[in-house]
Amino acid sequence: MNVNVINHPLVRHKLTLMREADCSTYKFRTLAIELARLMAYEASRDFEIEKYLIDGWCGQIEGDRIKGKTLTVVPILRAGLGMLDGVLDLIPTAKISVVGLQRDEETLKPVSYFEKFVDSMDERPALIIDPMLATGGSMVATIDLLKAKGCKNIKALVLVAAPEGVKAVNDAHPDVTIYTAALDSHLNENGYIIPGLGDAGDKIFGTR
């Protein structure tokens, strides 16, 4: 499976705090931002760099910068917005694209009700953010939309993933790497990740 479980002590610690049944909206929201920041560091580890000259205090010196077009971060509405600030803390120059999906009542498959992409998508790396990778339907649909725009360098950043969701993404898009804080046990009969986080969107927005 093309999945990278970020096994960092701080990531594991913060994720456990989010799993607590009495985790407040404020605490859950804050931890989602902190985790996204830590995980984005790992997801950006292989960014390509290039050399260039700068004027330093002692004269001209050679330095490094990220090569190519600026990253676009792609939150899946609505829960993905809860991770956005964490990624932007680390990469404040990132451009933001947004995808909103809902389930078709007849086919039960996710369909887009809103999408807004930045320019030059075919030249930018894209980082999709969503707290939960459950069945994988929304993630696969979002990747489909990005590839239709010509995007070739795509990664997914999720807090918790189920094996079923990882398999769905790997089967449909084996070139996309998934970064997650935990690969959990399974989905229950209602499609919730076990042990998971519950409804991450409700917890982030305080609508539970």
From Swiss-Prot:
CDD domains found in the cross-reference section: PRTases_typeI
Reactions catalysed according to its record: UMP + diphosphate = 5-phospho-alpha-D-ribose 1-diphosphate + uracil
Documented activity regulation: Allosterically activated by GTP.
Protein's name in the database: Uracil phosphoribosyltransferase
EC number: 2.4.2.9
Gene3D superfamilies: 3.40.50.2020
Keywords (A to Z) from UniProt: Allosteric enzyme, Glycosyltransferase, GTP-binding, Magnesium, Nucleotide-binding, Transferase
Family: Belongs to the UPRTase family.
Cofactor binding mode and count: Binds 1 Mg(2+) ion per subunit. The magnesium is bound as Mg-PRPP.
InterPro entries per the UniProt record, alphabetical: PRibTrfase_dom, PRTase-like, Upp_B, UPRTase/APRTase, Ura_phspho_trans
SUPFAM superfamilies: PRTase-like (SSF53271)
Entry's Gene Ontology molecular function annotations: GTP binding; magnesium ion binding; uracil phosphoribosyltransferase activity
Cofactors, names only: Mg(2+)
Pfam families: UPRTase (PF14681)
Biological function: Catalyzes the conversion of uracil and 5-phospho-alpha-D-ribose 1-diphosphate (PRPP) to UMP and diphosphate.
Chain residues that bind 5-phospho-alpha-D-ribose 1-diphosphate: 78, 103, 130-138, 199
Binding site for uracil: 193, 198-200
GO BP, sorted A to Z: UMP salvage; uracil salvage
This protein's pathway: Pyrimidine metabolism; UMP biosynthesis via salvage pathway; UMP from uracil: step 1/1
